A protein has these predicted regions:
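Short, high-confidence coil segments that cap the C-terminus of an alpha-helix
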Residues: 191-195
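Short loop-beta-helix segment that forms the pyridoxal 5′-phosphate
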Residues: 165-171
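Short conserved active-site loop signatures built around small residues
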Residues: 176
Length: 195
């Protein structure tokens, strides 16, 4: 059976936004859970969440988002992003750099990408609020596209020019495990060289 190696890591999490921060948080038992203001309302039974302080993505307009300056996202791309796509984009940039993969390797038909996402309920909620307040004609035509589970995969594929196998997996809390396992199988079965 073909051996498979993890050669690049990237993180955007509530316990750190790079491998050094995540390792430090794990070693020092820091959890990353906070009480965000948006949950501090009587009707919300949930009062805590994992927050990512380096990113300010409250605006419904992605062009107003604030995130670490080392991540470059072309305007044409970010307009179709939901917050989870930006998090994935930034962590993927770290992983690509960590693995020392160049853009030509990514465009090789033997390079694929499998992602895990349930979509963006936040984006759906914001778009429905806008539609309810201003009418359907005021809605962004990309509203649904930027909210569905597949948006993560097709945004990353298009942005990086990936021509190999691509798929978005949605299976609740098992989604990431399924994406990793399926990507592992693609390499072991000789269908892809890198995922």
């Amino acid at each position: 059976m073909t051996e498979v190696w993890v050669t690049g890591l990237g993180f955007v999490t509530s316990i750190g936004c790079d491998s050094a921060q995540v390792e430090d948080s794990l070693l020092n038992l820091r959890h990353g859970i906070a009480c965000p203001n948006m949950l501090q309302v009587p009707e919300s039974p949930v009062k805590v969440a994992g927050t990512i302080d380096e990113f300010e993505l409250d605006s419904s307009d992605p062009e107003d988002w604030k995130f670490p300056s080392e991540y470059k996202v072309p305007r044409s791309l970010i307009r179709s992003f939901s917050p989870h796509v930006l998090y994935a984009w930034c962590s993927l940039q770290q992983a690509i750099k960590d693995a020392n993969i160049d853009s030509q390797d990514l465009k090789d038909p033997e390079s694929g990408i499998y992602t895990a996402s349930g979509g963006s309920m936040r984006s759906i909620h914001k778009h429905f609020e806008k539609m309810d307040r201003n009418g359907v004609m005021a809605c962004n035509p990309l509203a649904i596209v930027s909210s569905i589970p597949g948006t993560l995969t097709f945004n990353l594929v298009a942005a990086l020019g990936i021509r190999g196998s691509s798929m978005g997996l949605v299976s609740a809390c098992a989604s990431s495990g399924h994406a990793l396992g399926t990507a592992l199988d693609e390499i072991r079965l000789g269908r892809q060289k890198r995922m």
